[in-house]
Amino acid sequence: MAFTDYETEQLHKALLKETRRCAVTLGMKKTSVDQLTKAVGIAKGSFYKFYESKEMAFFAVLESIHSELYGVADHALSEANGLPSSERAAEAVLAVCRRLSDTGDMVFIENDAKLAFAETAGGCQKHPLPR
């Protein structure tokens, strides 16, 4: 059964949300595609309509976190307009740190981000990681 555009959008959001939850609670290695699909109520084969692999789903989580943190920093900089540059920068860094703490995303970044990045197609070749 094919999904409507609306269903596709909602399932994609649900998969990303569940992958993020698992990233923080279980980690990438301990999370299976079966767990993700069961949580959102789709067949395992349907997962691959959204992501090429489990690793790509976790990479999408990294991209989502990056976008959110950029927005948090940008908002903090705007709110601190008029302060000296060093204070504005400090406000942005603190806002990002608070968000990482509040969401638990730092657990995923510390434990699995490098692995998620390295295991995505071409990740190592396009953007070599420091050793």
Give residue ranges: language-model regions.
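A short, mixed-charge helix-start or loop-turn motif at secondary-structure junctions
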Residues: 1-4, 51, 78-79, 118-119
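Basic, helix-initiating cap at the start of DNA-binding domains
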Residues: 1-26, 33-39
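Helix-turn-helix
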Residues: 22-56, 60
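An amphipathic alpha-helix adjacent to DNA-recognition modules
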Residues: 9-17, 29-30, 50-74, 94
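Conserved acidic
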Residues: 7, 11, 61, 81, ...
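Short, flexible helix-adjacent loops and helix caps
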Residues: 2, 27-28, 70, 74-82, ...
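Short secondary-structure transition hinges
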Residues: 98-131
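Hydrophobic alpha-helical connector segments
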Residues: 60, 74-103
